[in-house]
Amino acid sequence: MKTKFIFVTGGVVSSIGKGLASASLGALLEARGLRVSMQKLDPYINVDPGTMSPFQHGEVFVTDDGAETDLDLGHYERYTSARLSKRSNFTTGQVYFSVIEKERRGDYLGGTVQVIPHITDEIKHKILENAKGADVAIVEVGGTVGDIESLPFLEAIRQFKADRGAGNVLYLHVTLVPYIKTAGELKTKPTQHSVKELREIGIQPDILICRCEKDLPHDMKAKIALFCNVEEKGVITSADAEHIYAVPLALHKQGLDDQVVDKLNIWTKAPDLAPWESVVEKLRNPLKGEVHIAIVGKYVNLTESYKSLAEALTHGGIANDCRVYLRYLDSEKLESEGLGGLLDDVDAILVPGGFGERGTEGKIKAIEYARTRKVPFFGICLGMQMAVVEYARNVCGLDNAFSSEFRPDCANPVIHLMEEQKGVERKGGTMRLGAYPCSLSKGTFAHRAYGSLDVSERHRHRYEFNNAFREILVSKGLVISGIYKEGDLVEIVEVADHPWFLGCQFHPEFKSKPLNPHPLFRTFIAAALEHRGKRSQA
């Protein structure tokens, strides 16, 4: 079958939910047996988000092949089986970089390089490359219609209908219908103006997904359809959902996927949504109660920084049929003000990845609490490194143990710069990135969780466990349960005399899905559930 293209745009405001809408549509089309590719186009000039502050951009999602990408790719991977790569996310910076390189090589034969056709052709080329082998390619355009940065991308996708034929391209626009509480009314004018602006560019949307607090009444749908020149059935309500994994079911109920396959002339089987129905049922009515997890981090004022992590913990709850509540604790405050009983009523503690020295001592305090009080603990990336520092200081007696990232002249650098990182000066795209194999030791927490001795996980770091201190740490009871054999790099550490204490250098949250929870999060939440049971009996 010739590949069909669905372009998803957004209007009125940013962060309106284009990523979730795209991912949910991908899930629905896969449930019909179609092969789906997913892609995000970002209009900013950065080459990628790898050097951007989490407070600016939120989480940086890492793919198997080492791309540092937009967090929406995390939604795509969680909702679909699409294998994402460096081609799945590109920016204005990458497009211009590629075009300028071609011009310098003389590829344009002395011609004047312009936005049209050269930039738009490069955008179309990147879209087509990622779509190879797919029945349907879903392409989300970042930003908001009306942004000057988005214009070349919108022009490129406008040209697709002429290039590929009307029956092979569909435009889906996600827009806002705000509820004005003082007036007690939903307002359609922002949507009308957003679509008007899109049509002025030359794109007529086929389907509108209207984000709103409550369902749109029939007369309002009819009004939007009339003013925006779409069929009334093409006006889809996306009211605020109790759980984000209920969104595919809500969109299916309104016939979104039926309309898409009809407009694109695709014959498919009826969708099998039983797995999604099971997930939503477990989220709404968990049989085994609840657990409370403390996330001790640096970026807690913007929880989007930990998007995949929060979702992976939810997946662990789905696997254990329990509800997961997250308590975000600022590690800087713990550092300056102490724990103050903040961890006394939690069922498990997690210290996530991060960069910079600020808040590290607060994380170490939380880790010591978890280790000594036998509270289930999970350390990821920097969290694993700080667990090693805590163990070195408080169990091995290495008083000045720390990471050379923060104190280059510390006496006991139990965490140090990786050998291949020495001499690296450029910041962008130079970390240890992407999937690497990890060999596990029999009988460990990790081995029991995975049920295998060989696994592959995704990384994003420059610093590692210092093997010069391996002997003393192991002699005092630290378990090295996972290594990267090729470089003899320590990937997983555990504390044996503990219900569940594990730190990993990689980011397992990037591979967790609601339909297939990651084994480490599954067993971590199981340990939290068990700990809660013991606390309630005490």
UniProtKB/Swiss-Prot annotation:
EC number(s) given by UniProt: 6.3.4.2
Active site: C381 (nucleophile), H507, E509
Superkingdom assignment: Bacteria
Domain spans labelled Glutamine amidotransferase type-1: 292-534
Chain sites annotated for binding UTP: S14, K187, T188, K189, P190, T191, Q192, K223
Region listing for Amidoligase domain, in residue ranges: 1-266
Keyword hit for Nucleus: no
Residues at which CTP binds: S14, D147, I148, E149, K187, T188, K189, P190, T191, Q192, K223
Keywords from the UniProt entry: ATP-binding, Glutamine amidotransferase, Ligase, Magnesium, Metal-binding, Nucleotide-binding, Pyrimidine biosynthesis
Pathway(s): Pyrimidine metabolism; CTP biosynthesis via de novo pathway; CTP from UDP: step 2/2
MF (Gene Ontology): ATP binding; CTP synthase activity; glutaminase activity; identical protein binding; metal ion binding
Regulation: Allosterically activated by GTP, when glutamine is the substrate; GTP has no effect on the reaction when ammonia is the substrate. The allosteric effector GTP functions by stabilizing the protein conformation that binds the tetrahedral intermediate(s) formed during glutamine hydrolysis. Inhibited by the product CTP, via allosteric rather than competitive inhibition.
Catalytic activity entry: UTP + L-glutamine + ATP + H2O = CTP + L-glutamate + ADP + phosphate + 2 H(+); L-glutamine + H2O = L-glutamate + NH4(+); UTP + NH4(+) + ATP = CTP + ADP + phosphate + 2 H(+)
Protein residues bound to ATP: S15, I16, G17, K18, G19, L20, D72
Quaternary organization: Homotetramer.
Other comments on record: CTPSs have evolved a hybrid strategy for distinguishing between UTP and CTP. The overlapping regions of the product feedback inhibitory and substrate sites recognize a common feature in both compounds, the triphosphate moiety. To differentiate isosteric substrate and product pyrimidine rings, an additional pocket far from the expected kinase/ligase catalytic site, specifically recognizes the cytosine and ribose portions of the product inhibitor.
Family: Belongs to the CTP synthase family.
HAMAP family reported in the protein's UniProt record: PyrG
Name of the protein this chain belongs to: CTP synthase
